[in-house]
Swiss-Prot record:
InterPro entries: CobQ/CobB/MinD/ParA_Nub-bd_dom, P-loop_NTPase. This is Protein TraL. The keyword 4Fe-4S does not apply. SUPFAM superfamilies: P-loop containing nucleoside triphosphate hydrolases. Disulfide bonds: none annotated. To plasmid IncP-alpha RP4 TraL. Keywords: Conjugation, Plasmid.
Amino acid sequence: MAKIHMVLQGKGGVGKSMIAATIAQYKAGKGQKPLCIDTDPVNATFEGYKALNVRRLNIMDGDDINTRNFDALVEMIASAEGDVIIDNGASSFVPLSHYLISNQVPALLQDMGHELVVHTVVTGGQALVDTVSGFAQLASQFPAECLFVVWLNPYWGPIEHEGKGFEQLKAYTANKGRVSAIIQIPALKEETYGRDFAEMLQDRRTFDEALADSALTIMTRQRLKIVKTQLFAQLENAAVL
């Protein structure tokens, strides 16, 4: 059974492509060859990772789903031998979610012997409320055969609202049964770990590419190695992956 990992969140610039790239690198490190697809109609960030062989497929036509291209996406999934990782843009979040649900795509994938895993992001700072409600919306609308992984991204601040952490928020407690795993992206010290990781992401480089680059200082590579270890250890513990 292949797992179809789809990164969905209606807020832009919250780390969706980073998550898709991290999953792809984790899978590759296990000797797997996931099919990576970037469907973001505006920012093809995931496609920028040359080492991951990401295919670009624009599933939007204006504000609507391009059904012919979406059909092509389903065909790609159907013929995939391993897992599939799909990065999706904020602008296509609403139409894509509606299209997946109204066309009963999660059930279709299950009938093919595949499993749909939706990865969504919750961030601290100004986007906290929007990203939490985006998660709640997905969890309440998607059918039971769909699994969820929530990534907590503290880049813009701690993930808490009125003194409550994510796991105490109503959006989570009401949908707890839907969540297979919570991945905590490390809170990185801005001037060291944070800068190193941000530069690696801006360059669309994988951890392995950065760690093999002798032009980077020894300590920069050491810090990136620690971030990689922290992320991959959590993915290792997430049974859904």
